[in-house]
Amino acid sequence: MRQTSVARLYEDQGPRLQLTHVSGPLDAVLSVAEERMWPADLVGHLNLIHPTRLQVLGAAELEWARRQSREKVAHHLNGILSARPPAIIVADGCETPNIVHGVCTAHNVALFSTPHPSASVIDQLRLYLSRQLAEKISLHGVFMDVLGIGVFITGNSGAGKSELALELISRGHGLVADDIVEFSRTAPTVLEGRCPELLKDFIEVRGLGILNIRTIFGETACRRKMRLRLVCHLERRQPGQDDPNRLPVQQEQQVILGVSTPRVTLPVAAGRNLAVLLEAAVRSTILQLRGVDSTQEFIDRQSRMLMGDGDGL
């Protein structure tokens, strides 16, 4: 179960949203127990159907409450707060009504106020929770920023991942993480990779030991995070192993946290410039993201030639 607390939310987002703690404990928990439930579902406008959400009251909700009888408003508020939502936030700079304060106190629910618009508060908290409570996984490899594309370099121990990363850094690309990469699924089709705090800025290269990339190459050689766009697997051929497919019609894919990501396999051999090959793979990926598929273009050209339409090349 992925979870965070109201206290942590208040600490992280309080200054940005100018949250004022009016009353109530901060020990309530926001948790995601089901994979099909996204963290962004944990916050929204005042809602009787989803009473367990973090509830945000804006000017529209308070205007509706003013037109109703006190008994009706109290009935609805008690119905919502009896489900123990993590907190109530009064937004739009509105003054907190006494009835809201009283019901929150009676049910021991945290109450906050903010001058920010309710829609802005919800958007900001949804973004925060989607990152804070995202599905996470740690994988072995090197994560790089190559030409603005997040590339995850994998391979067996001794395949040359760190050496390739060092070569790419010397060519002006950026390091995100070496050895262990933490991936988070921040949206249905988005994987974001970053480095554990302990390993940040460091890379380990056989024969050289541990190097501080930020100190050696400067601030621009390191990245805080990147979106994963390509997996590059380094494969050292074993005796008797078949040659890799030279003309793959279907692009290889790797699934991480349910998100499918393009993958290329680069055979490792003496004399092969893997940095150049990886840069070419990244440029090809950029073209594919724009709808340009070089392999399919070649197949189409060959088909036209076989059909006797060679003049149309």
Swiss-Prot record:
Residues 267-272 are annotated as: Important for the catalytic mechanism of dephosphorylation. Pfam families: Hpr_kinase_C, Hpr_kinase_N. GO terms for biological process: regulation of carbohydrate metabolic process. SUPFAM superfamilies: HprK N-terminal domain-like, PEP carboxykinase-like. Keywords: ATP-binding, Kinase, Magnesium, Metal-binding, Multifunctional enzyme, Nucleotide-binding, Serine/threonine-protein kinase, Transferase. InterPro entries: HPr(Ser)_kin/Pase (IPR003755), Hpr_kin/Pase_C (IPR011104), Hpr_kin/Pase_Hpr_N (IPR011126), P-loop_NTPase (IPR027417), Ser_kin/Pase_Hpr-like_N_sf (IPR028979). GO terms for molecular function: ATP binding; magnesium ion binding; phosphorelay sensor kinase activity; protein serine/threonine kinase activity; protein serine/threonine/tyrosine kinase activity. Disulfide bonds: none annotated. It comes from the Bacteria. ATP binds at residues 155-162. The active site is at residues 140, 161, 179, 246. Its cofactor is Mg(2+). Mg(2+) binds at residues 162, 204. Its EC number is 2.7.11.-, 2.7.4.-. It catalyses: [HPr protein]-L-serine + ATP = [HPr protein]-O-phospho-L-serine + ADP + H(+); [HPr protein]-O-phospho-L-serine + phosphate + H(+) = [HPr protein]-L-serine + diphosphate. Residues 203-212 are annotated as: Important for the catalytic mechanism of both phosphorylation and dephosphorylation. Both phosphorylation and phosphorolysis are carried out by the same active site and suggest a common mechanism for both reactions. HAMAP family: HPr_kinase. Homohexamer. The Walker A ATP-binding motif also binds Pi and PPi. Catalyzes the ATP- as well as the pyrophosphate-dependent phosphorylation of a specific serine residue in HPr, a phosphocarrier protein of the phosphoenolpyruvate-dependent sugar phosphotransferase system (PTS). HprK/P also catalyzes the pyrophosphate-producing, inorganic phosphate-dependent dephosphorylation (phosphorolysis) of seryl-phosphorylated HPr (P-Ser-HPr). NCBIfam families: hpr-ser. Belongs to the HPrK/P family. This is HPr kinase/phosphorylase. It comes from Azoarcus sp. (strain BH72).
